[in-house]
Structure formats: C-alpha cells, structure tokens
Regions:
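Class I SAM-dependent methyltransferase SAM-binding "motif I" and its flanking Rossmann-like core
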Residues: 16-78
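A contiguous loop/helix-start segment that scaffolds small-molecule binding in enzyme catalytic cores
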Residues: 1-2, 81-151
C-alpha cells in the first residue's frame, strides 16, 4: 500500500505536522519518497538577497514577550557573529506583533526580509533595513509569512 502527505501550505514535514506521519513510517521501516515542490523557506532565501550559503530555520519563536525578545536578540547576534541568515515564522494572526518585536529587539542597520504569500496571489517579498521599515510595516494579518534577518 502507498500513501501521500500533502501540506496545506509550504513543504510537508518541514515546520509541519506531516513530520509525525513520516516519523511513524520510518519507525515501521516503510519506504519514504520525498517529492520536490515549492518550499517557502528556500524560496524566501532565494528572494531575500541574504546569505544562501549559510542559513538557519528556527520555526516558531517563543510566544512569551520576554523570551521572544531574548530569542530575537540571540538570532541577530548569530547574523553578525556567524554571518548566517536567520529565518523564522509566526502564526499569521501574530505576524504584525512579530514585526513590532523585531523592530524593538534588533539594530536599525539589521536587514529584515518579509516574505508573505509566496507563490500565491498577492505575493509580497521585500528586504529593507529596520531603519527603512520604520513606520512602513505592511499589514500581514492572516497571511502566511516568513521573516528573515541578516546584516
């Protein structure tokens, strides 16, 4: 018997509950065949203008404000110390809050790429310094989005 895993958005099993299904298949010694399709993570790196040689995807950051600010500062430090692009996502209804937190936690010269609705109608991918974003953040409520920071 065969089965497939399809993701509603993004790539199955990457920051997706499909990973649980794949883990079960691996434990049962079933053959797993990944198929190539669009990955918003890779597409956002490609469109950002950031380092595509060294990058890290962190999934969802902490919700608690203090922990989130601490994590954002840690990721920004990795940008400058390791020259590594940092990627993360947020639940769409919290995107605007995430952008505000990035603006508060990170340096004005740090670059932020906002990649939203990738491969969909209304696709939005822009890279600017935080100083350039100030006062001009888009409304991303209820839109799938990836955030990337770099120097």
């Amino acid at each position: 018997n065969s089965m497939g895993v399809i993701s509603e958005a993004g790539c199955p099993a990457v920051a997706d509950p499909g990973a649980d299904v794949v883990a079960i298949a691996q434990r049962k010694n079933m053959k797993v065949v990944p198929l190539v399709g669009p990955s918003s993570i890779i597409l956002s790196v490609m469109a950002s203008g950031f380092n595509g040689q060294s990058f890290a995807f962190h999934g969802y950051l902490p919700i608690e404000p203090g922990e989130r600010m601490k994590r954002l500062k840690e990721l920004e430090q990795r940008v400058y110390s390791e020259h590594q692009t940092q990627l993360f996502i947020e639940t769409p209804y919290r995107n605007n809050k995430m952008m505000e937190d990035i603006m508060k936690a990170c340096r004005p010269q740090t670059k932020l790429c906002i990649a939203a609705n990738i491969t969909c109608e209304g696709e939005y991918i822009k890279t600017k310094t935080l100083k350039e974003w100030k006062g001009k953040l888009p409304d991303l409520t209820k839109i799938p989005c990836i955030f990337l920071i770099y120097k």
